[in-house]
Each structure stands twice: as C-alpha cells, then as structure tokens.
Amino acid sequence: MAANGSTQLSQKEADIKMMCAAEVHLGTKNCNYQMERYVFKRRNDGIYIFNLGKTWEKLMMAARVIVAIENPQDIIVQSARPYGQRAVLKFAQYTGANAIAGRHTPGTFTNQMQTSFSEPRLLILTDPRTDHQPIKEGALGNIPIIAFCDTDSPMRFVDIGIPANNKGKHSIGCLFWLLARMVLQMRGTIRPAQKWDVMVDLFFYREPEETKPEDEDEVAPQAEFGLPAPEYGGGDQWTTAAIPDAAWPGEAQAPISAAPAAGSWNDSAAPAAAEGGWDAAVPPTTAVTNWE
C-alpha cells in the first residue's frame, strides 16, 4: 500500500511539474464567481493563479467519467480554438473518441434532418466561451459536458469544469495528454507505474511554417538528379577575332548589278513576252487633254 501510494504521489508531483512548465496554472485578470474555489492566489499584475492540485483531481474525475462510457465512439471531443485542434485529434486517436476540429455546425446535436446529426453520450470541450454553441445544444439534449474552464469562463450548463489555462497552445496540449494517459491507465492499456511512450509534444499546436522541413531549399537540377554540369562544345569556333581574307572560299558569287535608270516614264523598254505563249502587255493609252 505504501509503495502504491508513493508511486501515485510521485506521479502526481511529476504531472504538476509538467503543468507548471506548460503554464496551466496561469489564469486571466478576470475571475468568475464560480471559479473562485479553484484559485490559489492573485499576482501583483492581476493574473489569477490556479491550484494545480485541484486541477489534477478534476482531470482524474473526468477520466473516470470517460472510462464509464462503454463505447468510445459515443464520446465527442471538440475544439473551435485553433490551438486545441491538434490536441483534440490526437486525443481521439489514442482514446477512440470522435473529434470535431474547427467550427461547430449549428444543429449537429438537435436537428435530425442534418447528415451530421449525432447523439453523443459525452461531450468534451476546450473552452466554454468559444464552444458556446455545442454547450447550448448539449444542454437541450441532456448530454453531459466536460470543459476546460479558465478563470473568466462561464460555467453554465458545464457539468465537470477542469480549472486550467485554456488559451495557451502548450497548456491545452498538456491537458489533453494527461487526460488521455489517465484514460488509458484506467482502461488497463498501460500500467499506472509505466511511462507512456507517447511524447506530450505531439499534442502541441504547430505553426504551418513548422510543418515544412527546414532543409527544403532549392538545389540545381544536376545536383538533385546526380547529373554532371553540361559542357558545351565548340568553344574554339566561337571567336571574336577577325577572319583573314585568305580563309574565305575562292569562288564567290558575282554581285548583282543594279538596273539602269530610265530617263522618263516613256523611255522604259516594253516588257517582253512571258514564257508559255502569253503576249506582251499592252501599254496604257495616254489620255488626251486640252492643257497646252
């Protein structure tokens, strides 16, 4: 019993250290009256600090509720906040739940005429303020709701509120990683004293620029395909030196002489008969005028 207690205590301490490193304990400058019970203190700059011991206990409670659902497909984990979409997809991958990353389509839980209509048994959200539409629809359908709540988050229609920083990309990834590991431990997939081989970095939000490899630079085609640089022959032939007269061929074509200039229009010779029997062209008649 003592060994199990020490193992659980050491694991709890390690989780709290990880949450401190991911800034899970940092709240906002505003505090809802329903979140005051989870606040440890207030800093001089007005930022509220969460009690991470209560955050860890709420994570354990949420994991017990998730394990109580027989079919993981009846669980929907959703995040409209961009920082939580990657964490939502990873959580659904390891726990078997359904993930909705992005904007919530109104009527998904209430309108039976929609093709995306579903009736989940449990709804897990990242931010009650951002995901207010699924919270309202879940309340109309009597769906239990688990949400990560900041100090300024509204708690209406939220059944289990996990006090944590739900605005940082490291904080959201750390929370979903801890929740997924607790669920797998309670299901028996991994032992309680065993370290999970999945890194928490996989749950963090990544910028689109970070997904590209750093060494993706433009290279020359010959370097890419292993071809040598092209060599152009005839380098000695293309010279700018003057060519001597003796190098030119001896038999050159005689230049074409210019036609003799006629004195007037009437002095020009009449055209000869064309080949093939055609007669010579008749010269035009001169019009008689009275100008003298």
From Swiss-Prot:
<comment type="similarity">
    <text>Belongs to the universal ribosomal protein uS2 family.</text>
</comment>
<dbReference type="InterPro" id="IPR018130">
    <property type="entry name" value="Ribosomal_uS2_CS"/>
</dbReference>
<feature type="region of interest" description="Disordered">
    <location>
        <begin position="256"/>
        <end position="292"/>
    </location>
</feature>
<protein>
    <recommendedName>
        <fullName>Small ribosomal subunit protein uS2</fullName>
    </recommendedName>
</protein>
<keyword id="KW-0963">Cytoplasm</keyword>
<feature type="compositionally biased region" description="Low complexity">
    <location>
        <begin position="269"/>
        <end position="281"/>
    </location>
</feature>
<dbReference type="InterPro" id="IPR001865">
    <property type="entry name" value="Ribosomal_uS2"/>
</dbReference>
<comment type="function">
    <text>Required for the assembly and/or stability of the 40S ribosomal subunit. Required for the processing of the 20S rRNA-precursor to mature 18S rRNA in a late step of the maturation of 40S ribosomal subunits.</text>
</comment>
<dbReference type="GO" id="GO:0003735">
    <property type="term" value="F:structural constituent of ribosome"/>
</dbReference>
<dbReference type="InterPro" id="IPR005707">
    <property type="entry name" value="Ribosomal_uS2_euk/arc"/>
</dbReference>
<dbReference type="InterPro" id="IPR027498">
    <property type="entry name" value="Ribosomal_uS2_euk"/>
</dbReference>
<dbReference type="GO" id="GO:0022627">
    <property type="term" value="C:cytosolic small ribosomal subunit"/>
</dbReference>
<keyword id="KW-0689">Ribosomal protein</keyword>
<dbReference type="Pfam" id="PF00318">
    <property type="entry name" value="Ribosomal_S2"/>
</dbReference>
<comment type="subunit">
    <text>Component of the small ribosomal subunit. Mature ribosomes consist of a small (40S) and a large (60S) subunit. The 40S subunit contains about 33 different proteins and 1 molecule of RNA (18S). The 60S subunit contains about 49 different proteins and 3 molecules of RNA (25S, 5.8S and 5S). Interacts with ribosomal protein S21.</text>
</comment>
<dbReference type="GO" id="GO:0000028">
    <property type="term" value="P:ribosomal small subunit assembly"/>
</dbReference>
<dbReference type="GO" id="GO:0006412">
    <property type="term" value="P:translation"/>
</dbReference>
<dbReference type="InterPro" id="IPR023591">
    <property type="entry name" value="Ribosomal_uS2_flav_dom_sf"/>
</dbReference>
<keyword id="KW-0687">Ribonucleoprotein</keyword>
